[in-house]
Amino acid sequence: MTKHYDYIAIGGGSGGIASINRAAMYGQKCALIEAKELGGTCVNVGCVPKKVMWHAAQIREAIHMYGSDYGFDTTINKFNWETLIASRTAYIDRIHTSYENVLGKNNVDVIKGFARFVDAKTLEVNGETITADHILIATGGRPSHPNIPGVEYGIDSDGFFALPALPERVAVVGAGYIAVELAGVINGLGAKTHLFVRKHAPLRNFDPMITETLVEVMNTEGPTLHTHAIPKAVVKNADGSLTLELEDGRSETVDCLIWAIGREPANDNINLEAAGVKTNEKGYIVVDKYQNTNVEGIYAVGDNTGAVELTPVAVAAGRRLSERLFNNKPDEHLDYSNIPTVVFSHPPIGTVGLTEPQAREQYGDDQVKVYKSSFTAMYTAVTTHRQPCRMKLVCVGPEEKIVGIHGIGFGMDEMLQGFAVALKMGATKKDFDNTVAIHPTAAEEFVTMR
């Protein structure tokens, strides 16, 4: 007998879990379909394990770059990869348990398996059919790979989190935040690391101050940056090493090669055609601002829509969707403007709003005023290994409304959230000037710029 639900989410990642739990809280009969572990990319092969590894790299850097100037004996050189991975796995297991508990508390049926549409209201899972009045597609994305000879010898970000040991020599190919973060972590943990980017720099869509500072630090601390590097082929050598060959004749031999050239939607195995759901030329599901697809009763959130590919965005969109559908809020939807983001690079980056070039293009040069600060964070200033910290406020109009906040340096990852609230509320430079600084902190620079 076919089982019927009020609401079904395909995909047990951040967006699917957030939306289905919110719907269940409002008394809806709900099911969540997931073939793998709960939590999706973020919890299992993304944000969470990446952040654990980033912390590990920071600890190593604290010991070897800064420890001696703070009076510590830093001759310790032992690092146990297996211990780190065990700790990371245990932490992720606790998150899985938490998800299971909350879903159970909300009486959500968790169905293990792959879902395929039979029609716009019917799904097939594990040979059985289920129906629903509302269906959410939250299948996320997966890493992309280049179409070159030897591509199979490399791994992607998923494969990085399955490594049994830290390789001695690593090449990371890509210029986005995933490539920058992975290269930074691997370099920070002590491997000889190379980052290959297709054009002149990584993170080219960020404010130029961010990009320039990141490249400056990379040139001093690593990883080794290779610009204008277009992969041609990968050759596996007799000793098991890999040689990455570039189109211009350059090459580099490493023990591990990681593709981090971008991500693509995971929409191709759920038989969208049977439901009539439209996708664009890149395979992303087309949705409106309310997360509606072209088919009534079918919705999509997260990385499979081509929107901002960040976990909190999928969570926020999923919850707002359930508020609209099941809590009598007909206009509830996510505002995708001014979404803050952090890159867990070395040093970390925080940014929200318009870059300086974007503001000048949108408002005109005569309407834009920029405030900057460049200094050395106290954490590194008392040592011989000093690292830059740079910040920028982008303001527009006679009232100097703040439309962009950008920073790179120690502590920026934890600093940005509150300032993002201020920008979202329409704060002006005068509002920042009228705020008393917290001293001594790096954050005080944002309210003392002149």
Pin down the residues of each PLM region.
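Flexible, glycine-rich terminal cap/loop adjacent to redox cofactors
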Residues: 8-36, 41, 48, 52-62, ...
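Glycine-rich dinucleotide-binding loop and its adjacent helix/turn
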Residues: 47, 139-192, 196, 224-225, ...
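FAD-site-proximal beta/loop scaffold in flavoenzymes
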Residues: 152-168, 251-328
